[in-house]
Amino acid sequence: PEVRQAEARYMPYQLKTTLESSGYWGSVWVVPQRSDAVDLTVTGRIDLSNGLDVGVHIGAWDATGREWLNKGYTVRIPEKAYSQYREPGQDPYQVLYNQIANDLLAARRKLSAAELRTLRNVAELRYGAQLVPEAFAGLLEQDRAGIYRLRRLPAEDDPMVSRMQAVREREYALVDTLNEYYANLYYEINKPYEDWRKMSREEVIRYQDLKRSAYVRGTAGALAILAAI
């Protein structure tokens, strides 16, 4: 459906802004596919979204292949989440994004400063190996579980490292441009998407009320028949 396609672009951008506003992360981008140029990749699947309930499955893996997060989230959205008096910038699904952000931060805090430095080095070398495999051969090893480990760092004056870093910076610039597109789309659909969620929430509640009342009537009828017998 068109709404789900729009959500698939809107929700990652809302999570991006949530992570950035927390102040615990550096650059956060929305990208169409995984990239070896980054330290951590977060992926998601929308399982349910009707304005009243939202359910997603989130996975997060760092450049070493280590899993940070792999779990489902289901949240019931209260009516006050759609209030015009809520805090500016707060999405009706904000509680969901906050839960994901908190879990990612908890996973990061389990790593030492040395482990985080190694993670950044592995991300850089994996990207370099993708560009020029022979120049970065032997710097990393991958175990049977698929985890990358740092064997050694290249020489500080290695010209291939400088070239790789220059290429990566150009890729970052392209991703920045792509995120301007996502930002424009985000602000363009923000109001109609919220209106749809609010209306959908009310319809879901009405439908559930009708089902409940129909069940009560049916049960009462069955009891009446039993009593008559």
Residue locations for each model-derived region?
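Amphipathic beta-strand/beta-sheet edge segments enriched in Tyr/Trp
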Residues: 43-84
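Short hydrophobic membrane-inserting alpha-helices and related fusion/pore-forming segments
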Residues: 223-229
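Hydrophobic H-region at the start of alpha-helical membrane spans
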Residues: 218-221
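C-terminal/domain-edge helix-coil "capping" segments
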Residues: 69, 76-216, 229
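N-terminal segment of the mature soluble domain
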Residues: 1-36, 99, 103, 180-181, ...
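Acidic helix-start/capping segments at beta-turn-to-alpha-helix junctions
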Residues: 31-46, 119-126
